[in-house]
């Protein structure tokens, strides 16, 4: 039997997820950003405009993840794997001190954006395990390949360039998705406010900027991307773009690999509506 998720639920989830994964949370804010109008940032944003990030799949995947605590735990566990791999590789780049631009970029934002520990704690809080799906294993393998990629053996300073693609896909998603998906998730699952650390800002040096002047942090993120891309050839930048396209696909696979994708999304949509109604009733009375 095939399940069809009502269009209203799909539109609601897609609009929420588009805010969470694309830099353009609104037309006005997108126009206000300047550093994504040129350089590597512009080239990476093209992947969004060309539809390589499947908003419908992400929206349905989000709904499925809030259908019950077990599914949420599985989703967060599978996300923990690529986050942990990426952040480990980035710290290794800093330790090696070969890719100077990337090292400076990561040192500047790491305490604000790292999420692997938060994901690990959330999975434990939900009573899940940390065993990722095969899709997450493929994602991790891609990250490790990206971390070791160089222009050639004679250019160790280019090692890790392709990690910029994974930072773009994951961290811009968190910056916009954290505050917008946290509350719906908690309402659908009946969790206390701010109980999921993945969706709350880190206690980093730019915490207040992220909370109250998020666009400034996004501008800084784009600026650092452009600085890293400035010394690359056009061919090298294109490899970063292709890696971002791959990362979008690998991310979608995490949501679609398990059985019951559409039926779970339908149940999650009902849980989300129910959670909102309960919240409204509690405020009213």
Which residues fall in each region the model found?
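Metal- and O2-centered redox machinery and metal/ROS homeostasis
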Residues: 2-285
């Amino acid at each position: 039997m095939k399940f069809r998720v009502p269009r209203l639920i799909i539109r609601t989830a897609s609009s929420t997820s588009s805010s969470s994964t694309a830099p353009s949370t609104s037309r006005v804010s997108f126009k206000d950003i300047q550093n994504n109008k040129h350089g590597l940032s512009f080239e990476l944003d093209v992947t969004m405009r060309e539809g390589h990030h499947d908003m419908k799949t992400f929206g349905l995947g989000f709904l499925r993840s809030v259908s019950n605590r077990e599914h949420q735990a599985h989703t967060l566990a599978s996300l923990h794997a690529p986050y942990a791999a990426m952040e480990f590789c980035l710290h290794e780049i800093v330790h090696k001190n070969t890719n100077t631009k990337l090292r400076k970029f990561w040192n500047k934002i790491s305490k604000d954006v790292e999420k692997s520990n938060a994901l690990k704690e959330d999975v434990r809080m939900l009573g899940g395990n940390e065993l990722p799906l095969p899709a997450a294993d493929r994602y991790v393998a891609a990250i490790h390949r990206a971390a070791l990629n160089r222009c050639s053996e004679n250019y160790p300073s280019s090692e890790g360039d392709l990690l910029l693609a994974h930072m773009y896909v994951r961290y811009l998603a968190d910056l916009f998705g954290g505050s917008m998906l946290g509350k719906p998730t908690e309402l659908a699952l009946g969790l206390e406010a701010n109980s999921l650390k993945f969706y709350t800002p880190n206690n980093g040096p730019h915490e207040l900027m992220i909370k109250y002047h998020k666009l400034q942090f996004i501008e800084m993120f784009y600026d650092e991307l452009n600085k890293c891309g400035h010394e690359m050839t056009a061919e090298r930048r294109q490899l970063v773009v292709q890696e971002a396209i791959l990362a979008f696909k690998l991310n979608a696979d995490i949501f679609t690999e398990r059985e019951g994708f559409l039926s779970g999304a339908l149940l999650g949509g009902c849980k989300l509506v129910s959670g909102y109604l309960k919240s409204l009733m509690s405020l009213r009375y």
